Amino acid sequence: AKDDAEMVYVGKASANHTMRQPDINKLLVKLAAEGKTVARLKGGDPFVFGRGGEEAIELLEAGLPFEFVPGVTSAIAVAEYAGIPVTHRHVATSFAVITGHEDPTKGESTINWSGLATAVDTLVFLMGVENLTNITKNLIANGRSADTPAAVIRWGTKPEQRTLITTVGTAAADVA
């Protein structure tokens, strides 16, 4: 960025948001409406649980031009960084990316546990460590073997990345 660029940190960590998403949306609209060139940097792909869609709607409704530069989703990048392919022609021919942290205001879960447990080879749950007990319980209850290999990866692609190789049946206890 240029020396005179204004930089606003709006990063988020679990239960620690420096700015709420509606406020981020308003800030993007405000700065763009003032004629400023706004660059919103995000980790991963802004359209995979990255709130890019929400930001785009706000900018569209305000009649402001914008563009997105695709990123590499952490759903693949983190697994790759740990040396784990999400597909492999001899082992896994499909994968799904699922939120591990559904919006608590929507009430009932909309995750298709039976479909995920039996119809998809590799399951990638993002933001799921805090809900790991619920995730593994639902997978096993819907037909996924407790002996299925699993990896729990925290702080993906960062120097402090930690990868735990475990099973679906023991993952929650192993992380606790």
Predicted regions and their residues:
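A short alpha->loop->secondary-structure connector
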Residues: 3, 60-64, 86-88, 141-147
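Hydrophobic packing residues within well-ordered alpha-helices of enzyme cores
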Residues: 1, 59, 78-79, 135, ...
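Glycine-rich, charge-decorated loop segments at or immediately adjacent to ligand/cofactor-binding or catalytic sites
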Residues: 76-83, 161-164
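Structural signal for conserved beta-strand scaffold positions within catalytic alpha/beta enzyme cores
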Residues: 9, 68, 88, 96-99, ...
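Class I S-adenosyl-L-methionine
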Residues: 1-72, 169-172
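A contiguous loop/helix-start segment that scaffolds small-molecule binding in enzyme catalytic cores
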Residues: 23, 33-39, 51, 57, ...
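Short, glycine-/small-residue-rich phosphate/pyrophosphate-handling segment
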Residues: 79-101
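A short acidic, often aromatic-flanked loop/helix-cap motif at beta-alpha or helix-coil junctions
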Residues: 13-18, 74-75, 103-105, 158-160
